[in-house]
Amino acid sequence: MFFGRDDKKEAQKRGLTVPLLPLRDIIVFPHMVVPLFVGREKSIAALKDAMAHKGPDDKAVILLAAQKKAKTNDPTPDDIFHFGTLGHVIQLLPLPDGTVKVLVEGVRRAKVKKFHPNDAFFMVEVEEVEEQTEKTVELEALVRSVHSVFEAFVKLNKRIPPEMLMQVASIDDPARLADTIVAHLSLKLNDKQALLETESPAKRLEKLYELMQGEIEILQVEKKIRTRVKKQMEKTQKEYYLNEQMQAIQKELGERDEFKNEIQEIEEKLKNKRMSKEATLKVKKELKKLRMMSPMSAEATVVRNYIDWIISLPWYDETQDRLDVTEAETVLNEDHYGLKKPKERILEYLAVQQLVKKLKGPVLCFVGPPGVGKTSLARSIARATGRKFVRLSLGGVRDEAEIRGHRRTYIGAMPGKLIQSLKKAGSNNPVFLLDEIDKMSTDFRGDPSAALLEVLDPEQNHTFNDHYLDLDYDLSKVMFICTANTMHNIPGPLQDRMEVIRIAGYTEPEKLSIARRYLIPKEQEANGLSDLKVDISDPALRTIIHRYTRESGVRSLEREIGGVFRKIARDVLKNGKRDIDVDRKMAMKFLGTPRYRYGMAEAEDQVGIVTGLAWTELGGEILTTEATIMPGKGKLIITGKLGEVMQESAQAAMSYVRSRAERFGIDRKVFENYDIHVHLPEGAIPKDGPSAGVTICTALVSALTRVLIRRDVAMTGEITLRGRVLPIGGLKEKTLAAHRAGIKTVLIPKANKKDLKDIPLKIRKQLRIVPVEFVDDVLREALVLEKPEEFGRKPTTDGGKLGGTTELPASPAVAPA
């Protein structure tokens, strides 16, 4: 019997009339015991009525239903959910303030069928909801799943006691399991009401399963957040604790005082240092930040380094120029022999500086082969002008940051090499040597040559901005001197900012003078022979120059002289100290087998072999060109690792020769029945340029006419299809190379006649230099002809024809052997 009735089903049909207790923010489920505090008069009256009309089992029955809105103080039937829980009033305790504390137990779900009129409290007729008790395999699986999820939920939710897990594990009834679990979940009121109104235990468990899964996900995120926050708090607390300890230790050791002293020292330096206004403000700002930092923090170290760099730079510190032009000239001549042009330019600068007082530093570029004294001349210029000297090697530099520095945001950032060098010099007007400017390259880190555009521009470099300093620095007083072996690798805009001064190779008399004045005393001292009298004769020096070196400069000559002195040093230790005279034979004995042959490029006059002249970054060179013919189908073969321009020159020369075949006495059938091969020896070395045009043309004419070429003639020049000889570059270097090789006659383009003044007078007197305007002029000078004046002037059929053999035919055009 339920609530004292004889038949439960009959009671459900008839309905049950009970008082209703509206609840705020709480829903009571069956099997749930809840304490409630009741203060509203209607609610207290409902409880008193339930206690006054107990059933036969002596239990007070009341319907526990939730309000839709908790804020409603005087709810109407529409403000209350019409689905609640029938419960027993276990205990009722009036309180002194007029409220009532009541303990209720939920028993069964019930629906409100009807509200009875009653002003004192709500009296309702309810219909009990029967729980489904049939068990299935699916329901059993659902029960187990809910048990498992609830276990995971309890482990994450610290608000539910672990004992609750054991209590729930003992419940097998699906309906009771769902009601027991939901009572301990922190769900929204509407979610709990929905579960209360779900009559099917299976659906209730499914819904509960979904809700718990969602709660578990939220709890897992909360756990991660709590763990992260806890770790952060522990770290912060640890750092705080350690910092406090550190400060205490520093206080004991006096380090904090040392940090304060360091800041005071920086402030003192700032007062005494002349800097730009921008730099002064920047240092003050950084100093303010430094005071707020811990002395041991990484950021404090970065700020300290930055301030040190700014203060240590020579913003207005400069050396006074030695403006005495005569004294400066004496210093330059003491250090270097020759080099007239660069010396004149420096003396001109000093003269103008003496008159104008304020003059921007020049930007010079010394271009010449290795060993001619470009770098040492820059050092000598610094000595002559009384300035500090700094050198920056640009060979292999491919990172823009090497010039402009790294931004301070990077770890280990530093200023660029320019600023570092100026700090090292301690002066804002040094002689700054940018060595090997043609050896820079470019990659993904930027183009250093583009960064130098601002540095070497007198109109811009007074506001040079280094990335690290982020301040404008004045470079306009610096005398920049660049060095390069060739101009080809220097970008055009950068060339435009420099005053190029070409330094050609040394002549033999100049090398002799340099050896006597500088190299011999230097090597004698370097090898510990200063107290001995060692005399190296001129023939010995000439032998070293001719047979052991072949260069434009004197670097190899210095090495060979050093080798002679090392042999002498060994001989002195072995045989005792004595004065030594080194003659030609002794020099050759000391240095071993000669490396080079001096004299004519060729031992005798030959067919198809011409001595040409080339200009490389190492200076002037002798370039032999060979041509020969063989039976074939008229192909032109070109070998010797030639560049595209030189190959085109060979093709142009061939076209010119074919166009004048009759005048040269060449049978046209030769071009159909013979292949022509042009080769430039030393095939491993790349060669390019148009200036070998006349050389190739002469070799072709000689090979096709079987006329010998004079071995004492060298030539250079570009040719056109009309036979004109065009001007070339590097005439001085090429002429010096011819002189070194013992050549007697040099053929040059007539348009280069104006450049002869650059060639030393002694060399011009020792050479026969012939300006030529047409290829015919070249051939008349180079070929061994009986009547040179008539060659090529009119068609001829005499001699020179080939009849299927490459042997030299007897011909009136060929000089007798």
From Swiss-Prot:
This is Lon protease 1. It comes from the Bacteria. Residues 18-216 form the Lon N-terminal domain. The gene is lon1. SUPFAM superfamilies: P-loop containing nucleoside triphosphate hydrolases, PUA domain-like, Ribosomal protein S5 domain 2-like. GO terms for biological process: cellular response to heat; protein quality control for misfolded or incompletely synthesized proteins. Belongs to the peptidase S16 family. Homohexamer. Organized in a ring with a central cavity. Its EC number is 3.4.21.53. Residues 604-785 form the Lon proteolytic domain. Residues 789-817 are annotated as: Disordered. ATP-dependent serine protease that mediates the selective degradation of mutant and abnormal proteins as well as certain short-lived regulatory proteins. Required for cellular homeostasis and for survival from DNA damage and developmental changes induced by stress. Degrades polypeptides processively to yield small peptide fragments that are 5 to 10 amino acids long. Binds to DNA in a double-stranded, site-specific manner. InterPro entries: AAA+_ATPase, ATPase_AAA_core, Lon_bac, Lon_bac/euk-typ, Lon_lid, Lon_proteolytic, Lon_Prtase, Lon_prtase_N. The active site is at S691, K734. Induction: By heat shock. One of its GO terms (cellular component) is cytoplasm. It catalyses: Hydrolysis of proteins in presence of ATP.
